[in-house]
């Protein structure tokens, strides 16, 4: 009996654990501190800084099953998903990694043992082929002489993509960053399937399928194309879980493995589909994986960056559900089946199930409102189409009006063998794309980040002032030996009390001082293992090797500590009041305010806000001790410490607890006791995206300032109402009641005046072939009174056509009324349109009543004068 996908995942991790590898959890799909990536798209992403020498781990061998998304940017598989056997937006990458430990020999031997060993995957050796980079004689020799693969099954691949190092067997993540030659392992499905070995003209067939890529990480590619040797040669491997599952389960398509079979059946159930071979089922089964995990990792549908990619995938899935005949929202119903089939890899998704379902349901409902109209428009355009290409302007209109991503339009067209003029679409989109490029940091040069080889020791938990030695200086991102007065720079010290921005807490400010110089620090940031002090040298000169006195702004740090501790209390209080589904989605802890984004599907009620505020203040009054303990990550989680999903933690972590009320992993700075916070007040609660709420709050002196400000406002209002703050509510209610009474009396007077005006107007009507025509501009009449006046005049005049106008603050308001017996000849909508056009406006309505507005008041007299001739012509 073949292994399930979950069993294959576990077997891979168990094998490498037995070879001394640390099993590391999958990182978030949102890359941590990497400006070059839209999404995590490979197992090595979370180790990129390790390969570059910017980060250190307490292990030199690691293994992971990494969640990946490829649906945007360079690695974009979206358009092929559902139409091929192996393309996915979401997949799991099994990998083993060596950080300066083993290299080519062990990497190849490990792979061979796992794939062919009787106790592991037990694949037939004669079915395996390998490729190596053309000049990598070492890897070739290991495969031939040590593993024993015949030469005819070892293929050298050169630079087959038109440039040096541009090869299927030379791996690089992007234009810059870690790279190196690789060896790939292929599985031969047999001669009953069409296709040839890698490097042959038939290599695109499905017979020979790549199952494992082993990269020998030797270089860091610079922006100018040069290759710098990495500090230590390393190994990065990747094997798609879905691909190896297809091989081990003896199927030729990833969509036939147990995981996808289960999901496809679930899709069929919620959409009512009966043909399990329908490609739309495959599309939706794939897309629920990427969408659910992206939302769980904090990405929300939007019109930019990651949120837009998510929106595109959701909408593509919804459109395919529509094709299958789904009559109601269905996509969110697949989250439950997905959690079941993912096993241990779906634990975080299970914790956030309600939140993920709500986000997907809301997005589907929003799109469903425009999907039908958009598809109707597209059908119209395709019916009129002459040729085989839809113009870019129509594709843009579908995007702009109905929210159709261009790839969704292309998807519909593809089914009818029609192409989309994507160049024309891009032209129409250029202005929006230009703005998006300016706002986005994605695609930046990874090497543009300051690279510091040294490390800084942070001593700010216990010290706000100490001496440190300058180990590096940077001006405009480039290392320098010295700076002079007036220059802005980044100063790196061997040890520092300054806290670098992390975990939502802002970086410290202060001064670096010495004999004859002062450097004003206005921010502190991390650069790998180093801490950089950003600021300006206000006096003197500073050079590498100098000793400085580092002084943190103590008062500012104190306010930050209070706000950070209050954030932890509020997080715990929110979970108590709203439920365990509350999860942090973002935070800002500054000296002035704390801001906390969290998952929750509706606005908080005033009573809930008050309850959270009261609960936090109760913990402040308890004056709980705030304690920190350093322990192993798994032990901390076992103790119940909350870890922020997507945050990167070391194996040993800092656990911060506040009595029995809150326990979290946190590297920030905090008060000593909760009583130090003094007072906590929530100043706003709002929504930032579907399923995400935001609270802003203040503490200590800031909280007292809001109390005083509120008291001052109440006293000001009481003074205006000639009362005091004790009976303010009664006073305001009395004023509002009196105001309502006066408004009612005023309306009655206006109605009487309108009736009198109508009576006097009726005498001004002229007779046109038995129809009374009344055209008049009224001064000092509110626009909303015109309709009442037209109704009164109709009753008085019998067979009639009426046009009334008024001008308020330079804007023209028009109304036309036509008695029922005349609407066959004169239609109010046409009449009002003719008049409105002359005053720079437009309008419409029913044949017997129509309204319009305009902006050209000066043209009104002439427009009204034209009515009689227009009506006369209609009455002929």
From Swiss-Prot:
GO terms for cellular component: cytosol. It comes from the Bacteria. It is an enzyme of class 6 (ligase). The keyword Hydrolase does not apply. Its EC number is 6.1.1.7. One of its GO terms (molecular function) is tRNA binding. Keywords: Aminoacyl-tRNA synthetase, ATP-binding, Cytoplasm, Ligase, Metal-binding, Nucleotide-binding, Protein biosynthesis, RNA-binding, tRNA-binding, Zinc. Zn(2+) binds at residues 564, 568, 666, 670. Binds 1 zinc ion per subunit. InterPro entries: aa-tRNA-synth_II/BPL/LPL, Ala-tRNA-lgiase_IIc, Ala-tRNA-ligase_IIc_anticod-bd, Ala-tRNA-synth_IIc_core, Ala-tRNA-synth_IIc_N, Ala-tRNA_ligase, Ala_tRNA_ligase_euk/bac, DHHA1_dom. GO terms for biological process: alanyl-tRNA aminoacylation; negative regulation of DNA-templated transcription. HAMAP family: Ala_tRNA_synth_B. Homotetramer. Catalyzes the attachment of alanine to tRNA(Ala) in a two-step reaction: alanine is first activated by ATP to form Ala-AMP and then transferred to the acceptor end of tRNA(Ala). Also edits incorrectly charged Ser-tRNA(Ala) and Gly-tRNA(Ala) via its editing domain. Consists of three domains; the N-terminal catalytic domain, the editing domain and the C-terminal C-Ala domain. The editing domain removes incorrectly charged amino acids, while the C-Ala domain, along with tRNA(Ala), serves as a bridge to cooperatively bring together the editing and aminoacylation centers thus stimulating deacylation of misacylated tRNAs. PANTHER family: ALANINE--TRNA LIGASE, CYTOPLASMIC, ALANYL-TRNA SYNTHETASE. Belongs to the class-II aminoacyl-tRNA synthetase family. This is Alanine--tRNA ligase. It comes from Salmonella arizonae (strain ATCC BAA-731 / CDC346-86 / RSK2980).
């Amino acid at each position: 009996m073949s292994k399930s996908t979950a069993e294959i995942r576990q077997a891979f991790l168990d094998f490498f654990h037995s070879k001394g590898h640390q099993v590391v959890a999958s990182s978030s799909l949102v890359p941590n501190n990497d400006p070059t990536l839209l999404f995590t798209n490979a197992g090595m992403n979370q180790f990129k800084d390790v390969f570059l020498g910017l980060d250190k781990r307490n292990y030199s061998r690691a293994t992971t099953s990494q969640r990946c998304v490829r649906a945007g940017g360079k690695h974009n598989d979206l358009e092929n998903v559902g139409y091929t056997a192996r393309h996915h937006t979401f997949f799991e990458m099994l990998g083993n990694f060596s950080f300066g430990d083993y290299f080519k020999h062990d990497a190849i031997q490990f792979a061979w043992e796992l794939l062919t060993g009787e106790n592991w995957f037990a694949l037939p050796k004669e079915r395996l082929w390998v490729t190596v980079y053309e000049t990598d004689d070492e890897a070739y020799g290991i495969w031939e002489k040590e593993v024993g693969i015949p030469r005819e099954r070892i293929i050298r691949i050169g630079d087959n993509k038109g440039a040096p190092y541009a090869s299927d067997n030379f791996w690089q993540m992007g234009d810059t960053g870690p790279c190196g030659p690789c060896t790939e392992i292929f599985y031969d499905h047999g001669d009953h399937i069409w296709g040839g070995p890698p490097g042959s003209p038939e290599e695109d067939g499905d017979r020979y399928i790549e199952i494992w890529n082993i990269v020998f990480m030797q270089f860091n590619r610079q922006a100018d194309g040069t290759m710098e040797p990495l500090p230590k040669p390393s190994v990065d491997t990747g094997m798609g879980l879905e691909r190896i599952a297809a091989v081990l389960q003896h199927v030729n398509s990833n969509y036939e493995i147990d995981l996808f079979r289960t999901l496809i059946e679930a899709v069929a159930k919620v959409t009512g589909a009966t043909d399990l071979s329908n490609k739309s089922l495959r599309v939706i089964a794939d897309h629920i994986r990427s969408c659910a995990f992206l939302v769980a990792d904090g990405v929300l549908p939007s019109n930019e960056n990651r949120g837009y990619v998510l929106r595109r995938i959701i909408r593509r899935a919804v459109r395919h559900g529509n094709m299958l005949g789904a009559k109601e929202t269905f996509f969110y119903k697949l989250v439950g089946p997905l959690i079941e089939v993912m096993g241990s890899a779906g634990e975080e998704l299970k914790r956030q199930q309600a939140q993920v379902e709500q986000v997907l349901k809301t997005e589907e409902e929003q799109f469903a409102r425009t999907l039908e109209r958009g598809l109707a428009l597209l059908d119209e355009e395709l019916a009129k189409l002459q040729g085989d290409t839809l113009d870019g302007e129509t594709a843009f209109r579908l995007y702009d009006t109905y929210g159709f991503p261009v790839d969704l339009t292309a998807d519909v067209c593809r089914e009818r063998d029609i192409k989309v003029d994507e160049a024309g679409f891009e032209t129409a989109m250029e202005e929006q794309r230009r703005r998006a490029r300016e706002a986005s940091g994605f695609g930046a040069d990874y090497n543009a980040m300051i690279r510091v080889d040294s490390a800084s020791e942070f001593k700010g938990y216990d010290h706000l002032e100490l001496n440190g030695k300058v180990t590096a200086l940077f001006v405009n991102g480039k290392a320098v030996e010295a700076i002079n007065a007036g220059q802005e720079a980044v100063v790196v010290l061997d040890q520092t009390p300054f806290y670098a921005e992390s975990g939502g807490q802002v970086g410290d400010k202060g001064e670096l001082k010495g004999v004859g110089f002062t450097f004003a620090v206005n921010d502190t940031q991390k650069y790998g293992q180093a801490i950089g002090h950003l600021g300006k040298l206000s006096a003197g000169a500073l050079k590498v090797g100098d000793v400085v006195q580092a002084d943190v702004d103590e008062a500012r740090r104190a306010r930050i500590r209070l706000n950070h501790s209050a954030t932890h209390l509020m997080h715990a209080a929110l979970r108590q009041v709203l439920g365990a589904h509350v999860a942090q989605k973002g935070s800002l802890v500054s000296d002035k305010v704390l801001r906390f984004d969290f998952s929750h599907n509706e606005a908080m009620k005033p009573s809930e806000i008050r309850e959270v505020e009261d609960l936090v203040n109760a913990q402040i009054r308890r004056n709980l001790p705030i304690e920190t303990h350093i322990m192993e990550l798994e032990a901390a989680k076992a103790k119940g410490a909350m870890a922020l999903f997507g945050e990167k933690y070391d194996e040993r972590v800092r656990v911060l607890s506040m009595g029995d009320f809150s326990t979290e992993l946190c590297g920030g700075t905090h008060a000593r006791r909760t009583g130090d916070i003094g007072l906590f007040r929530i100043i706003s609660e709002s929504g930032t995206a579907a399923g995400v709420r935001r609270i802003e709050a203040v503490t200590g002196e800031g909280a007292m300032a809001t109390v005083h400000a509120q008291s001052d406002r109440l006293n000001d209002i009481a003074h205006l109402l000639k009362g005091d703050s004790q009976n303010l509510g009664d006073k305001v209610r009395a004023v509002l009641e009196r105001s309502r009474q006066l408004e009612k009396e005023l309306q009655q007077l206006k109605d009487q005046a309108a009736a009198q005006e109508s009576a006097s107007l009726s005498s001004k009507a002229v007779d046109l072939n038995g129809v009374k025509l009344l055209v008049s501009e009224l001064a000092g009449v509110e626009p909303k009174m015109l309709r009442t006046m037209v109704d009164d005049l109709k009753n008085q005049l019998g067979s009639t056509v009426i046009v009334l106008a008024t001008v308020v603050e330079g804007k023209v308001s028009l109304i036309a009324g036509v008695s029922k017996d005349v609407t066959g000849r004169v239609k109010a909508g046409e009449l009002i349109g003719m008049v409105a056009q002359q005053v720079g406006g437009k309008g419409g309505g029913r044949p017997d009543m129509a309204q319009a507005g305009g902006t050209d008041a000066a043209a009104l007299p002439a427009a009204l004068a034209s009515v009689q001739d227009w009506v006369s012509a209609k009455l002929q």
